[in-house]
Design a protein with these regions (language model features):
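An extended, acidic, His-containing surface patch that forms the Zn2+-binding/catalytic region
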Residues: 78, 189-190, 247-310, 317, ...
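Sec-dependent N-terminal signal peptides
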Residues: 4-13
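A short core secondary-structure module
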Residues: 164-166, 220-244
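Acidic/His- and Gly-rich active-site-bordering loop/insert found
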Residues: 19-117, 123, 130, 136-145
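Acidic/histidine-rich, surface-exposed loop or edge segments in extracytoplasmic proteins
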Residues: 25-35, 211-214, 347-355
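Second-shell loop/turn segments in exported
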Residues: 32-40, 114-119, 196, 217-221, ...
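Acidic/histidine-rich catalytic neighborhood of metal-dependent amide-processing enzymes
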Residues: 114, 120-197
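Short amphipathic alpha-helices in soluble, non-transmembrane regions
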Residues: 225, 336-344
Length: 452
């Protein structure tokens, strides 16, 4: 298998024995490995993991989908049961240090938290997966199935240089894999009770580019209409006419599970969400209090990018907008696009599909889902595990599309609101909770992959 020449400082930080590795220290180092996407440079992360595998004598393979866009994977051979993959992405979104209390690309410990870009999404879980993989390697004689570790590029921009590329160009890495753990769900503490969500499906991203054309001219002589005004009118109509609300089965199950720990009117509302969404003012109130819960009730579109003239005194002949739409996974993209066109086409808008994926759902009858339930209940007796629909998308859509039962789960327990730094400022993780999650992920892997 292919080996890499890695930077010396990676080798210096790694001890010979996996027993001597500290997950918090490893995560601190990993945060300092620059994989901000764009441009990605995920080969830096490949070198990071390769240095660990080299020192521990673990064979691995690597591949670049483009210069600097590295992917790495390793397999531990086990018994004859279908293989299980631990999948992570190594890229992170940009961070502006001016808005942080710490350097986002330096793992900083402060008041019991580790701060840094990616500690939640998803270098923290990635390192936890590494430690679960190393535990399996140390106990490989007990394995009832192969365990595959895979760290890929580009998830934050769609995964086309990462997991998607791997499936097309290195399908052998997925040989025999029928179970997969990825990002997507985690635990939240509500007083003395805990709810752990496991992502089983996700809203389908439909990214669109809108184009409006009109007569150019001088800014001093406004025309009755222009490319920009047409685009503004179309976007205003889109914004003011949200898609009809509906509750699909996985979302209904999730809301009912949340209702168990609620009281009074809120409990009644969440127990019967198909009826509740019809109440006047409810959806507006839900969006204000919890945008993520509201996003589970309907298809959504966020206007994220605008492009017009390059000069303030020039009326441009063409204007553009890009829109991030997320579709509930109960219908096809074509049907959604028809609904979208009804809202903008009368304004002379051309629509270009940038990206869209197909919907897929993983079964809660899976042995991996049951292992998550068992270990979580064992470690947190007052907890409940609920299947969830993610409003965002992960690389799991690639693997679900080829029949791999894929679940998004991080066993870390957090207080409500602790995840606010994801893709934002001051992303942080509680160190005590993080250490516990590393051990719990080992237990989940042992439950599903070790001979009893």
């Amino acid at each position: 298998m292919k080996k890499l020449i890695v930077p010396l400082f990676f080798l210096l930080m790694i001890h010979v024995s996996s027993n001597e590795l500290d997950p918090v220290a490893v995560l601190q180092e990993f945060v300092g490995v620059d994989t901000v996407n764009p441009p990605g440079n995920e080969t830096n992360a490949v070198n990071f993991y390769a240095s660990i595998f080299d020192r521990l004598g673990i064979e691995y393979e690597t591949a670049e989908s483009a210069p600097g866009r590295g992917n790495i994977w390793a397999r531990i051979k086990g018994g004859s049961l279908p293989a299980l993959m631990l999948l992570q992405h190594t890229d992170v979104v940009p961070a502006d240090e001016a808005y942080w209390d710490t350097n986002p690309l330096k793992g900083t410990i402060k008041d019991g938290y580790l701060y840094g870009r990616g500690v939640i999404d998803m270098k923290g879980l990635g390192v936890a997966q590494l430690f679960a993989f190393l535990d399996a390697y140390k106990n490989k004689e007990k394995l009832n199935r192969d365990i595959v570790f895979m760290a890929t590029a580009d998830e934050e921009a769609g995964g086309f240089f990462g997991a998607g590329w791997m499936l097309e160009n290195h399908p052998e890495a997925f040989d025999g894999v029928k179970l997969l753990l990825n990002e997507g769900g985690s635990g939240t503490s509500y007083g003395d009770k805990q709810v752990f969500s496991v992502e089983v499906t996700q809203k389908v991203p439909v990214w669109l580019r809108l184009k409006s054309e009109g007569s150019p001219g001088h800014g001093s002589s406004p025309q009755t209409t222009s490319s920009v005004t047409q685009l503004i009118e179309a976007l205003s109509n889109l914004y003011n006419n949200p898609f009809d609300a509906r509750i699909i089965d996985p979302v209904d199950t999730y809301f009912k599970a949340l209702a168990v720990d609620m009281d009074g009117e809120e409990k009644t509302q969440f127990t019967n969400m198909p009826k509740t969404i019809l109440e006047e003012g409810f959806l507006e109130s839900l969006q204000a209090s919890s945008p993520s819960w509201h996003a589970l009730t309907r298809d959504t579109c966020s206007i994220t990018m605008l492009e017009g003239s390059s000069k303030i005194n020039v009326v441009p002949p063409v204007a553009f907008a890009e829109v991030d739409c997320r579709m509930l996974p109960d219908r096809g993209v074509d049907e959604f696009l028809n609904d979208f066109k009804e809202r903008v086409s009368s304004y002379g808008i051309e629509i270009e599909l940038i990206m869209a994926f197909g919907p897929a759902v993983s079964s809660t009858e899976s042995e991996l889902f049951r292992a998550i339930e068992k270990v979580t209940k064992q470690e947190y007796p007052n907890s409940r595990v609920v299947p969830a629909v993610s409003t965002g998308f992960t690389d799991s859509h690639f693997t679900r599309e080829i029949g791999i039962e894929s679940f998004g789960f991080n066993p870390m327990l957090s207080e409500a609101g602790d995840f606010r730094g994801v893709h934002g400022n001051n992303e942080r993780v509680n160190i005590t909770a993080y250490r516990k999650s590393v051990e719990d992920l080992k237990l989940i892997l042992q439950e599903v992959a070790f001979n009893k």
